[in-house]
Amino acid sequence: MEEKKGEPLFGKVVPLPLVEEIKHSYLDYAMSVIVGRALPDARDGLKPVQRRILYAMMELGLRHNTAYKKSARVVGETMGKYHPHGDSAIYDTMVRMAQDFSMRYPLVDGQGNFGSIDGDPAAAMRYTEARLYEIGELMLADIDQDTVDWGPNFDESLQEPLCLPAMLPNLLINGSSGIAVGMATNIPPHNLVEVVDALCYLIDTEPEQVDIGEILFRMPGPDFPTGGLILGRDGIIDAYRTGRGKITMRGRTHIEEGKRGKTFIVITEIPYMVNKTNLIETIAKNVQDKTIDGVMDLRDESDREGLRIVIEVNRDTDPNLVLRQLYRRTQLQSTFGVINLALIDGYPKELSIEEMLNIFLNHRRSVVRRRTQFRLEKAEARAHIVEGLVKALDIIDEVIALIRGSATTEEAKEGLISKLDFSEAQAQAILEMRLQRLTGLEREKLEAELAQLLSDIERYQTILGNPKVLDSVIKEELLEVKRRFGNERKTEIIDAVEDVSIEDLIPESDIVVVLSRDGYLRRKDLQEYTLQGRGGKGRKGTALQEEDEVALVAVTSTHRDIYLFTSKGRVLALKGYVIPESKTGRGKLINRFVALEEGERVVTMHGRAVDGAKYAFFITLRGTAKRLDLSELENLTRAGRRVMGLDEGDEISQIVLTSGDDHLLIVTAQGQALRTHESEFRPMGRTARGVRGIRLRKNDYVIGCDVVANGRWPLLLSENGFGKRTKYDEFSLRHRGGSGVIVMNLSDRTGLIVGCWSVAEGDEIVAITSRGRMIRLAVSESPVLGRTAMGSIMMRLDEGDTVATASVVSTEDGEDD
């Protein structure tokens, strides 16, 4: 008999295809593991078993200032009420929350043997005891004030919190790790002080103004409980931007000189999650196998004072060479693969650092809002009662007479409501009032309580009605957590050794860096461009795809930073040698080297060293100008930092470095120029928008700005190859905000001005066209003409080609301008 799919057999058995049943069952299992076991909630940073353990400990009254209780009691409470799984899994989770080498900020205070960094297991749960740390109690603070949602436990006999209020950002400060089905999470721990600083920055900053560089400035990277070192910042930047990255960790070591010329390598901190015993065994095996040479002895001198592994080195062996072998062949140097995967509304998602911080802030906003609403309702209810009691005291004789004249309590209650206009709640409170409340002192207490309640109600209403006030409450609580529990960073972040070694291996040479309009970055050796006479056509300098054009060019050296200023008012730093060298190719996309945001592009490149300069002067296309102290550009990385707030549609046109007492010449595309003193522009902070620098005509825009200097000229170059030098003396000093004077006589033949550069007699200029042709010219080839002159042909162009940009090379110091 042929059976139909899904129809019961004999009223009990439903036939289903085996493949379909396995598929659905496995998917159900996978989702159960993902949501209910392996991944943390992005709000409180806890997996379900961790959350249930903490809540069970709170219910047992295991506060930080109470007596310890047996771990078996905690495990039994958790398993019996909320987590019906193996007791060993629950105990192992609680043990980890008590280990100061596993958690940056342990939540559970364990007494007894809770394991060691050597990999020793914890004692059985019947021997150990536990209670909550004070910082662990913050995870549960205000849970009794309707701050979070609740759900039924496994047998629907009790309610359990679906998320804890979490006054501290646990996901970031303690991290998380877990393997689900088809996905895994591995979030590193961070320093509480730095995380709170980053959260406060987000609270104080408008969302559209938030900058990943500012977050990195306050929160430079993970802080592991075992200390050690982090090599390089690239992995951190990748993890913060995308949710994935690879961080290189290294143990902390130093070299000691002993008696009789002995030398020792001493390891005092090891990478996070590295087993000390396994590390020692690995070192010993490598020494035995002769893959690590020069080691005479190895011993573990760790005690209660701290970790100490001593490696005695042969007298004729360089200890630094042995150290490099240890980094290469043992876990003394390890990697931490960051996967910031957490649950949001029950769905797993990889999160950037900004998303993780915002999720916590939004959670705290919800918690504080619900807590305030709870307190408001409670205060209003109590104020209503106290108002009734005060009113009753005002007419106490009538109240007493009514009560004495009533046959029953219900009759008295009805009389108070109907005759004296009390509410039911007030009437009940009056009937329950003791006679001692009739004294004058008690009346004063009631009036004081009412005044305090009304003040509290007003404050609660302000918090609920004003998001800024709500955020200020959150910020105040975070700063208090930071004050009470913050401590110094344990893990030091240093520059990657590979960066130093690469720079040592690469000879320093002057290079031309080219960025195309499609975002391709490349470099060539400056010596490849031979000096040509005025009117030369140049040589092919860069291979570009059809319709791609050169956007920017700068001269720097392989060892120097090149500063990239973006359309969104940020500056990023990149070493010259990092840029790929190519004689004819397009290069590599700039996004492979620097962290550009969506829709952001580089508008200015500056390769000149900043030695001796004090300020950076910015001018935008629309003529807005700003002066910034150069100290604001220290410690730049490819993550970048915001240096100027911009109006919508505006971009940075030029940046020059100044001494603090310089004259500036601002030039526009339509041939206007304004000379002004930099003191007209007071120094501003990184996010300030600046002030008007020059007044522009219709459709005009700023193309350049230079520092006026003795023995130098402004060199102007038009899009059709015309150029000239003009004396600075022809431009009188004026106040900022003016429209300036004519600087070049323009026509259809010359085209608009593409740039203005300050040059000296011995300088050279490297110009590049929109089709990628380059020419290197001596500045002396450019004539010195009046400011109203048209100039002469500096570069002959093919039909349809135009000058894109240029860079000036100083023959004295090799620096660009």
Swiss-Prot record:
NCBIfam families: gyrA, PRK05560.1, PRK05561.1. The active site is at Y127. Belongs to the type II topoisomerase GyrA/ParC subunit family. Keywords: ATP-binding, Cytoplasm, DNA-binding, Isomerase, Nucleotide-binding, Topoisomerase. A type II topoisomerase that negatively supercoils closed circular double-stranded (ds) DNA in an ATP-dependent manner to modulate DNA topology and maintain chromosomes in an underwound state. Negative supercoiling favors strand separation, and DNA replication, transcription, recombination and repair, all of which involve strand separation. Also able to catalyze the interconversion of other topological isomers of dsDNA rings, including catenanes and knotted rings. Type II topoisomerases break and join 2 DNA strands simultaneously in an ATP-dependent manner. InterPro entries: GyrA, GyrA/parC_rep, Gyrase/topoIV_suA_C, Topo_IIA-like_dom_sf, Topo_IIA_A/C_ab, Topo_IIA_A_a_sf, Topo_IIA_dom_A, Type_II_DNA_Topoisomerases. It comes from Aminobacterium colombiense (strain DSM 12261 / ALA-1). This is DNA gyrase subunit A. Coiled coil: none annotated. A motif (GyrA-box) lies at residues 532-538.
